[in-house]
Amino acid sequence: MVKVVDGLPEQVLGEFPQGISLEEADGNSVILDIGGGNYATYAHFQPNSILVNEGDRVSRGDVLALVGNSGNSLAPHLHFHVMSVPLSLASNGLPYVVDSFTVTGRTLGTDEAEAEGTPLKIILVDPPGMVTEAMPLDQTVVSFEQSSP
């Protein structure tokens, strides 16, 4: 773990945050060195929920923190991306694939929900579909099989 930011407050649901600096944009977050000169950011955690420290080694399936609404965020979500340097807003984003995930739904009316502060409409996929070696598409709802510790 190369960077941990914790203790920033949650934002008001559905309201655009005011006065967020670039340093606070990711909110409570961690940056992980994933090898090969690449890094992964996990951002917008709940305050004081991060379970790792700088210098810690983590493994697949480890819980890092609780999903929240800190930083430049309108609603609770996990922001994840892979990048070329350990600086979220000053890096090149890199493509990645996920070993496997299940598509359980898709969202509708994201812009309206954000503008009006109303719940996001989710259309469930029936039956849910397993996807392998792919990147989840924008506006999809996915689940991941939890591995045993």
Write out the residue ranges for each language-model feature:
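Acidic, glycine-rich catalytic/binding loops that coordinate metals and/or anionic ligands
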Residues: 20-22, 51, 56, 81-149
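Short histidine-centered loop motifs in beta-beta connectors
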Residues: 38-61
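Active-site scaffold segments
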Residues: 30-31, 65-66, 76-83
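Active-site lining segments that contact anionic ligands and/or coordinate catalytic metals
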Residues: 27, 37, 75-79, 93
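Zn2+-dependent peptidoglycan hydrolase active-site motif and core
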Residues: 1-46
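Short glycine/proline-centered loop/turn elements that form peptide/ligand docking sites
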Residues: 51-53, 69-76
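A residue-level detector for short acidic-glycine micro-motifs
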Residues: 2-3, 44-47, 66-69, 84
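Short hydrophobic beta/alpha edge segments that flank linear recognition/processing sites
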Residues: 18, 59-71
